[in-house]
Amino acid sequence: MPKIEVKNDDLELALKKFKRVSLEIRRLAQRHEYHLRKGMRLREKRKIAQKKRRKFRNMV
């Protein structure tokens, strides 16, 4: 379980950090759930990068 320190009674910031850390852990576990060939792994990586680009383009 990730450990996050709450500073200056800022619970909102601590909760945001906790969610980010726990999401990274879940993604890592999901990635190692089963074996993917190198080409498939690269395709998945490109797909995720494309989603991130779309997300940040829409924010601007």
Swiss-Prot record:
GO terms for molecular function: structural constituent of ribosome. It comes from the Bacteria. Keywords: Ribonucleoprotein, Ribosomal protein. Transmembrane segments: none annotated. The keyword Ribonucleoprotein applies. GO terms for biological process: translation. One of its GO terms (cellular component) is ribonucleoprotein complex. Belongs to the bacterial ribosomal protein bS21 family. NCBIfam families: S21p (TIGR00030). This is Small ribosomal subunit protein bS21. It comes from Mycoplasma pneumoniae (strain ATCC 29342 / M129 / Subtype 1). The gene is rpsU.
